[in-house]
Amino acid sequence: MPKHGLDRDLVRMANQISRQFTYVSDDEAAVKVAYHLHAFWEPRMVAGLEAHAAERPADFEPIVLAATRILAEQYGEASAAH
Amino acid sequence: MTLIREQDFGTKARPGPATVHVQVDGRNVDVPEGTSIMRAAATAGIDIPKLCATDSLDAFGSCRLCVVEVDGRRGTPASCTTPCSDGMSVKTQTEKVQRLRSGVMELYFSDHPQDCLSGGGHGCELHDLADTVGLTEVRYGQPETSHQDAAKDVSNPYFAFDAAKCIVCSRCVRACDEVQGTFALTIAGRGFDSRVSAGQDQPFLDSECVSCGACVQACPTDALQEKTLIQLGPPNRSVLTTCAYCGVGCSFKAEMQGDTVVNMVPYKNGGANEGHSCVKGRFAWGYASHKDRITKPMVRDTIEDPWREVSWDEAIAYTATRFQQIAAQYGASAIGGITSSRCTNEEVYLVQKMVRAAFGTNNVDTCARVCHSPTGYGLKTTFGTSAGTQDFASVAKADVIVVIGANPTDGHPVFASRMKRRLRQGAKLIVIDPRRIDLVRSPHIEASHHLQLLPGTNVAVINAMAHVVVTEGLMDQAFVDERCEDVAEWAAFIARPENSPEAMEPITSVPAAELRAAARLYATAPNAAIYYGLGVTEHSQGSTMVMGMANLAMATGNIGREGVGVSPLRGQNNVQGSCDMGSFPHELSGYRHVSDPTVRELFADLWGAPIHPEPGLRIPNMLSSAIDGTFRGIYIQGEDLAQSDPNTQHVTAALMAMDLVVVQDLFLNETAKYAHVFLPGTSFLEKDGTFTNAERRINRVRPVMKPVTGKQEWEVVVEISAAMGYHMAYANESEIMDEIAALTPTFAGVSFKKLDELGSIQWPCNDAAPNGTRTMHVDGFVRGKGHFVETAYVPTDERTNRKFPLLLTTGRILSQYNVGAQTRRTKNNTWHPEDVLDIHPSDAEMRGIHDGDWVSLASRVGETTLKAKLSERMPPGVVYTTFHHPVTGANVVTTEFSDWATNCPEYKVTAVQVTPAPTTRPLIMHQVPLESTLVEVGAASAISASGVSASGAGASGAHASAVRTEAADPRA
């Protein structure tokens, strides 16, 4: 479908971001991805990503899943404050 | 009321350390060595008569009017071609000289329309000089042969050439050569038969002339004259302002009769353009008074209703009330705004302030999202500041110039003229572009290397170039050791075999040997400069590529002085400014993240409103959220998303899903079809404020007339905010800039007063740089050390396949501008009345397509129809089109893929198929799951906007998606 909601964007965008950090270890990449999402993604996008990852983790690269865990652990308070 | 007339010194300045002392008519004057007598005299306040000389051109010495006598020298040398020597004494008004001048003028007038002798056109130097030399009669009588019956050439829509008035001084020819660099004119014939010839003795319109107007400006008679000047007569006042087209930001004198613009003359002291311009800025300003201009606010409850003109009070109250209702029901995060890169800094600043303080959200973005947002990300990450490093004049010191993903002769023509001048002087050129742009080979210019890469492989190429630099020992080790960090990690990464030119060749299609040669040329040049455009940024790795270029520049020490650098050719007149003003969901003005509590406190204190600490939605996220139902109201200032943003069907579906779409613009555009409120905006001729160009140069925009809408745009924003309960108070635009300066360290020293004093200011302008900053990162990077980033090449997800085997890339053309809202409403349609599809002859032949045939251009998201133009400028497998005409709808086929860091759309890489179209009239069809409906543009159609909204919103699966494509009056 040419038109689409945010959810489809989130999967595509998150996976795309994760593929940019192949030059570091997966752990480091997850940290970088988490930072990027926290710095540039609006809270409903982060929340949508976390919800989708919890429900359908197979849609995401492993680095994205690791990044969502870091997001919740390190930035969770800030996200919840929105 | 006065006309601004810049002094013409007759010949160019010759800056240099040595000085000579001369005396002209008894006045002592010191000038740099090499200065002409003419210029020295002008410096001393003495104007020597001249016709063939002007200080934008090299001296020519043909008219013989400027002859003088020099003590101790024989004869009467031309003062324009004679340099001063130390101790020289010059006489400019001896009896002998006056006699010679009078004789020369008499000869000129012997073959010149007699009416010029007693009256003349505006600024006719020949007429003025006749008075100066005291010429009152021509004794030659009517010669047997003359040029008085010479035909006029009125082919150009903007200026006329009357050969009868031409004195063959060659100023026009030299202006076309030296200033513009097109070489479209010559002097044909010899002796009495000499005549100005365009092209191969063709009408101007049929020749290579690009209608920049440099010849018109250079002409000392009325031979070349603007048609508006002929029609309206001479102006009587000038207003200095700035062009509203591209990111060059040319300064102009708007020359007026009352409130009527007669002509726009490039301002010689304009920092960006120094007296030059292009066809758009100089001539295509008529859109400001076009009949399509909307001057009254309009509202409607639904987009199916006709528009209703209302008062400003009603429109503002309606807008404010609706935003408040939506926010109350769905939360402040359900509303937001988009600012324009065509509006002033002051206007943009206030819209983002309204969104943050009155709406209570960071859901504000700007059109830089779809063009140079990767520049902001990439240069901030590597250098520490989201802007280019140089000014335009810097190119004059470059020894090697790299142009990547840009076509400056079309997109930034005045800067291109500077670049071409440097190339003609011997600088080398490397072009990295899938298309053979004009710069690859044009008069007196040929690229040393054209790396004709496949679309989507920029990072592979730049990494391969950097690989050469590192592995062949071409790094400027002293520079990187002193000024940069993370060098070793980056060098180890880039040296890997997979980054070599040989490994990348199958991916990029660039021969390894060619790439190695180009890399060596760049790395070994004393000064090497990179200029780039949207062919870099509008990719899935746009930000990565910007960082890759920054890596290359740092690795070779090409940062921090003139002649080097990394310079984005920013598209719009104020896209730099709209970014500077914090019109981003994650940043406040000066590129400071909203999460920084110190910055938020600064704004909150001055604004009296809290700033949200989390980033807001970007434009693509706003649209997707609208389809989800979580984003429901939008304020769109001067942007036409429905034409300019990718995947048109997605955009229009999102707009239709919203409860409130407010459009502030000059004309009803594609986006306005989906709007509930239309607030008429002001053109640049009515605005009072500033634009910031690609050089970080803040220029004044001064009004030549009152707003035809009755209000300045910023006043409307202030009133909407007030109606929503947030009050702002400014007496004028200068006070808005004062607030910007108070809050933004890079603007701290900027004020309207200082801009009037200095003419323009390049930020940063603060205590450390009170007059602004020409070149960035001179002694150190803004972030401290330059940061090397490992830029792994990741192929785009957009792939060709059997169904879509070609790659589409898009771009601009000289005569039209962006979505064409302005230029389509001028005579520039003469040159580009429609978008066409450039296709390689071999691709066309395989498909049975001939030049001029209608073709269907289809991608996985949509299809459109346009005419084919066979061209070898692209390699086989790549097609190209522009996006200036809504009827073509080029963005119907572009996809949702975007830059990983910024969501800048990947306009430059779309997998498509091209097939002969079964019809002879243009069609736009959106791809649908089960059935398709063709809608003929211009034909009566039973499908209305209501049909679109009913079928387009909500339902998934089978539905007919028929889109009204004709820009019919929605008020009908």
Q: Locations of the language-model features?
A:
Chain A
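Amphipathic, hydrophobic secondary-structure cores in small proteins
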Residues: 17-65
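N-terminal acidic leader/helix
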Residues: 1-27
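C-terminal structural segments of small proteins and small subunits
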Residues: 55, 60-82
